[in-house]
Amino acid sequence: VSKEFAAYLTEYGREEKIPIKYTDLLDWQESIPVYDKDGVDTLWRSVIYPPHQQDEIFSALTEIYGLMKTGGNMEVIGHLTVAQIDFCQFGNTNPFRVKIRNLSNDVHDYFYVKKADASRVFGLEVEHILSPNRIFYIIDADTIIEEHIMGIPCDQFVESHLQRSEYQEVSLAKEFIKFNER
């Protein structure tokens, strides 16, 4: 990330100090594969940290979630906990997916911890500017935190939704046009 782009990110509140970095999460002790509901390997591995590191890691990740969702008001995150951390061994970013669980109502949410690079950050910023919806991310040196955006993974969408009626094809084309015009 160039100095100019870093200054832009700082000015618009995208650059912020976070309590844990991507490289800190790489030191897991064990991992087990994550399968989908049909028993197919998702290429994600649920990672397990040594007990002496786990509490510190979970606390830092919960704090990051609080930064994302409450603007830093840490008084409201006491009922949140990390339920699971998954590592994706496929793709160019090898992200960590963090599942946060609300102990009060058992609702969960996700966010991602990835290696930062200028093209990824630039792409997120352009998407944020062009999209009608706010896209939340934080960058700190070589780490980027991205919110989870609800939807269907592309490969599942292609397999299960594109083989449908002509009406849906027209509807899908209209959605792409709307997105392109934004």
Which residue ranges define each predicted feature?
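Conserved ATP-binding subdomain of kinase catalytic cores across diverse folds
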Residues: T23, Q29-I32, V40, R45, ...
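An acidic, glycine-rich, mixed-charge low-complexity segment common to nucleic-acid enzymes
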Residues: V1-P51
